[in-house]
Amino acid sequence: MDILWFIPTHGDGRYLGTNTGGRAADHTYFQQVAQAADRLGYTGVLLPTGRSCEDPWITAAALASVTKNLKFLVAVRPGLMQPSVAARMASTFDRLAEGRLLINVVAGGDPYELAGDGLFISHDERYEATNEFLDIWRSLLKGETVSYSGKHLKTENGRLLFPPAQQPHPPIYFGGSSKAGQETAAKHADVYLTWGEPPHLVKEKIQSVKKKAEKEGRTVRFGIRLHVIVRETEKEAWQAADRLISRLEDETIAAAQNAMKRMDSSGQKRMVQLHQGNRSNLEISPNLWAGIGLVRGGAGTALVGDPETVASRIKEYADIGIESFIFSGYPHLEEAYHFAEKVFPLLPFRTKLQSKASGEVIGNDHFPSRQKEKTV
């Protein structure tokens, strides 16, 4: 089991939809979150991509030098750069960070945003271009000389002179709920990612991608992207969830939902269907809460509960085939501690803690006793 955290390069705070309790999205704060994740033993961190975020490559490069074990799941956007340039960037980062790069291939799901970036192709054409991009990108990182002529991309005698630390290339994470997205994942992904839907829907996706990968003669691992709200008791956790959206105005929700309607991402449409923009009945599956998706694009669901309950829900996903979990929570610094301290001991997750927790010395003479953690 791998557990990753999240660097909030699009902003952070105690409440959604308001600047009250907000955090500065700057290098100092990103470094705090990254170093906390590193010290707590998270496998890595995801950095989001898009016009609402700081650039993930520059941010990850800045954070790699101030962390030790933490891996960085960084987005590549086919169509916005040539595969040869992306291959050189990936190889350089992976060497300088000593094998700590993971690649998140993002085809894009907002035609309005993509047009602003100069990309004017349809949903299915984006996946065609992504397939061609990854054909070239993977071959270059394997050390091959590449000549390629496709519908969208062409390369003549392309070479990568300096190989990455990880062979044949840094692991590829890929998400896509549509038929075209799943077929692309089956051909190229090492880890297929889904947003946090109820387990029975996630299981359907896993089965579908597995079948498609088998036809390609490949095996694919599976991951899930979720938020988390964990507290000592169920009551406290649900109160924290309610507080998170307590300052959301109806106009803010309506504006966010209208923006999501223009998107042609199948995964985003599935997220919206879970709550329909309605504040009521947000617990869409036991302990799976869709409140964040009222205003946040992309991952919009959270596991909510006490440590034992949240660990049990994670195990339910693991039992259907999920191996990689990418979590986040508001605010991201505090929630990284909440989750690691309360839930890690209950999971089959081997952390690389940089220092052992000790607690405060008692009476200037005794170390605190170690309590045996429950397992789920």
UniProtKB/Swiss-Prot annotation:
GO BP: alkanesulfonate catabolic process
Catalytic activity: an alkanesulfonate + FMNH2 + O2 = an aldehyde + FMN + sulfite + H2O + 2 H(+)
Keyword Thylakoid tagged: no
EC number in record: 1.14.14.5
Domain of life: Bacteria
Alphabetical UniProt keywords: Flavoprotein, FMN, Monooxygenase, Oxidoreductase
Gene3D superfamilies per the UniProt record, alphabetical: Luciferase-like domain
CDD domains: Alkanesulfonate_monoxygenase
A GO molecular function held by the record: alkanesulfonate monooxygenase activity
Spans traversing the lipid bilayer: none
Keyword Flavoprotein: yes
Top EC category: oxidoreductase
Similarity comment text for this entry: Belongs to the SsuD family.
Record PANTHER family: ALKANESULFONATE MONOOXYGENASE, ALKANESULFONATE MONOOXYGENASE-RELATED
NCBIfam families in UniProt: alk_sulf_monoox (TIGR03565), PRK00719.1 (NF001939)
Function: Catalyzes the desulfonation of aliphatic sulfonates.
Protein known as: Alkanesulfonate monooxygenase
Organism of origin: Bacillus licheniformis (strain ATCC 14580 / DSM 13 / JCM 2505 / CCUG 7422 / NBRC 12200 / NCIMB 9375 / NCTC 10341 / NRRL NRS-1264 / Gibson 46)
